[in-house]
């Protein structure tokens, strides 16, 4: 909708009324830096400007869908194509292109614009053979791509530093280009803003993306894809025969980038994983030289922990048997009895070095807990 926020009880998660000015007060403040003196007066300042025109974001949706079925329902499915344009998206004051000398936090404003498009495909197959076996297959695929059209970026920023023109949650990273092989490479490399004196042969050669001779936050560039997959796939296949049934479900994603390293629950890295392929002067390894607690710049890891987050997971398999109506079930007062054996998260095909479920977040700190593999043996009884 596009209803203006006019009710005083409508608040946002930071607990502030975005359409009201925020006042701060204090006293006994030192005035000036020469012969300072306290003032006995209480002062008031506007710490955040309100915006009385705050409203809900709006969306314009365009969809085209087709449902189909053939051969008496043996082949069925659907095709959906969509195109959305969202406008008036709320932009935080800290994300706005406001000069530092403005004097206070900029107000929230409905400035953002995002477009997205894609399609959804579904195919269902169902057939019963002459010998009584019923087999079925359900598959689906979703392709969704979004792009930030406007985000109130500073107009003089290079395009690669802007949010506009890129996907939501686009990965930004320092880019590494091989290793610093010799001391000459170290001396001739761009300056790190932190820990430059700690650079050694074997460290990553970080690309000075903007060419100013310094490695800083302005050298973080778009890398690979967003942390949200562009494509998702789902397939379920099963069969039934004389009370027996078997079922398997696969799930996969691609065109996604994820961060994976190996912290323990106390945020300490596992050395065997982190340094198992460390750099040596012959240049045979792909990782940097190991260190003994030396503080180095945050840029030093480059793209080391960013991986192609594509995977195909065997998410669930189940084998079951449902007892047919029999006298012994009736004698026990049981209408239906089914026994089953199933397993979850049985296998995953991926280029990532570890099994991290995507819904735990894209970063390693969110996904440090491993995906659990489970097996269940049970019985369902209906009285």
Q: PLM features: residue spans?
A:
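Solvent-exposed loop/turn elements at secondary-structure boundaries
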Residues: 1-57, 76, 80-114
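Residues on the lipid-exposed face of transmembrane beta-strands in outer-membrane beta-barrel proteins
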Residues: 64-68, 79, 121-125, 235-241, ...
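Repeated loop/turn-to-beta-strand initiation elements of outer-membrane beta-barrel proteins
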Residues: 73-77, 119, 130-131, 243-247, ...
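Extracytoplasmic gating/loop element in the C-terminal half of outer-membrane beta-barrel translocons
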Residues: 198-199, 253-343
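C-terminal beta-signal and terminal closure region of outer-membrane beta-barrel proteins
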Residues: 100, 104, 108-116, 159-186, ...
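Transmembrane beta-barrel strands of outer-membrane/channel proteins
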Residues: 1-3, 7-11, 15-23, 77-83, ...
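Transmembrane beta-strands of outer-membrane beta-barrel pores
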Residues: 2, 81-87, 125-127, 141-147, ...
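Conserved small-residue
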Residues: 4-17, 21-23, 109, 126-227, ...
């Amino acid at each position: 909708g596009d209803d203006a926020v006019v009710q005083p009880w409508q608040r946002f998660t930071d607990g502030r009324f975005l359409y009201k000015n925020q006042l701060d007060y204090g006293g006994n403040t030192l005035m000036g830096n020469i012969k300072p003196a306290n003032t006995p007066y209480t002062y008031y300042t506007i710490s955040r400007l309100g915006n009385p025109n705050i409203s809900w974001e709006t969306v314009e949706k365009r969809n085209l869908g087709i449902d189909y079925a053939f051969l008496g329902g043996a082949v069925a499915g659907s095709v959906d194509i969509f195109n959305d344009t969202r406008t008036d998206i709320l932009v935080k004051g800290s994300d706005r292109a406001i000069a530092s000398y403005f004097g206070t936090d900029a107000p929230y404003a409905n400035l953002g614009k995002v477009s997205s498009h894609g399609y959804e495909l579904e195919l269902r197959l169902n057939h019963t053979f002459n010998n009584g076996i019923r087999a079925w297959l359900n598959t689906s695929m979703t392709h969704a791509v979004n792009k930030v059209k406007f985000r109130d970026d500073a107009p003089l920023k290079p395009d690669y530093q802007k949010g506009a023109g890129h996907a939501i949650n686009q990965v930004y990273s320092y880019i590494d280009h091989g290793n610093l092989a010799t001391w000459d490479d170290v001396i001739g490399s761009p300056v790190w803003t932190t820990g430059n004196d700690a650079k050694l042969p074997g460290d990553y050669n970080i690309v000075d993306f903007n060419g100013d001779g310094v490695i800083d936050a302005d050298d973080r560039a778009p890398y690979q894809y967003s942390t949200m997959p562009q494509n998702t796939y789902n397939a379920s296949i099963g069969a039934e025969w004389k009370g027996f049934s078997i079922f398997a479900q696969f799930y996969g994603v691609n065109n996604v980038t994820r961060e994976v390293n190996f912290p323990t629950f106390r945020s300490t890295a596992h050395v065997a994983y982190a340094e198992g392929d460390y750099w040596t002067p012959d240049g045979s390894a792909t990782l940097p030289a190991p260190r003994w607690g030396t503080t180095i710049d945050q840029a030093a890891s480059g793209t080391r922990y960013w991986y192609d987050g594509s995977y195909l997971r065997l998410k669930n398999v189940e084998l079951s048997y449902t007892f047919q109506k029999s006298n012994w079930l009736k004698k026990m007062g049981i209408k239906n009895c089914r026994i089953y054996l199933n397993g979850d998260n049985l296998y995953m095909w991926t280029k990532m070095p570890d099994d991290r479920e995507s819904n735990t977040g894209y970063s390693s700190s969110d996904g440090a807990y491993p995906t659990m593999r489970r097996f269940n043996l049970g019985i369902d009884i209906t009285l």
